[in-house]
Amino acid sequence: MSSEVETAEAVDESEKNSMASEKENHSKIADFSDLLKEGTKEADDRAENTQFVKDFLKGNIKKELFKLATTALSYSAPEEEMDSLTKDMEYFFGENWEEKVKCSEAAQTYVDQIHYVGQNEPEHLVAHTYSTYMGGNLSGDQVLKKETQPVPFTREGTQFYLFEHVDNAKQFKLFYCARLNALDLNLKTKERIVEEATKAFEYNMQIFSELDQAGSIPVRETLKNGLSILDGKGGVCKCPFNAAQPDKGTLGGSNCPFQMSMALLRKPNLQLILVASMALVAGLLAWYYM
């Protein structure tokens, strides 16, 4: 009998030691915020090496495209952010902006995933808020805002990126990470959230793929005055610089960057493709500043 008690006590002690060891191992695991950062690093690197992002980081994306960065957010932003977004959208596209933009296939897939998570796995929304605010609005998007803001700076078109109650973005991010690390989640749930954050990168890479495909297709449009243009391919083109000289409307063997840009910007699908990807691009920039 005595030996049985001793054996039971030994088993209990062993289990306690095992649990203590497991707890200690968990404590040695990086903080949740670090798990998110490290867990998405590979996907982030792959996204960073897409052609669109490479061009962006090289400064080959025109500043005018910044206004499109707000559009995708109007589909997926939290309700409390819509007031600022609405002001930006009205500034860029007019009061009837909702009639002028259209969600692309890849962007819609991303939006559908966010809606699914919100309804079925709400804890996984942490992954999307992390990638949006830690990697985007409070980091890379601030860089984008500085690059595209008018001189002198006004608030027009950048309301969404202005956080009146956040005086120091770096300190706020530290506070946000501390809150992340304080979440009462088991390791399995944390790992699933990291997987969801990785999915966010995958969805954005699908959008980048759409961008690359759209950028490789010549865009043909007809101007209001009837002149046909073939943008980016040296075809018929009419720039504002020679608009007063119709006989010089054809630029043999040369490109018309103005019309090329304007024609692309008028394409609703391309607008949404470009815009939906800007948040992640901003996140990629954030890695250089975190």
Swiss-Prot record:
Instruction: Mark the HRM repeats by their residue spans.
Output: 238-243, 255-260
**Where would one find the signal peptide in this protein?**
none
Q: Where is this region: Disordered?
A: 1-33
Catalytic class of the enzyme? oxidoreductase
Q: Which UniProt keywords apply?
A: Heme, Iron, Metal-binding, Oxidoreductase, Repeat
What is the documented function of this protein? Heme oxygenase cleaves the heme ring at the alpha methene bridge to form biliverdin. Biliverdin is subsequently converted to bilirubin by biliverdin reductase. Heme oxygenase 3 could be implicated in some heme-dependent regulatory role in the cell.
Q: Which family does it belong to?
A: Belongs to the heme oxygenase family.
Its name, as the record gives it, is Putative heme oxygenase 3
Q: Which gene encodes it?
A: Hmox3
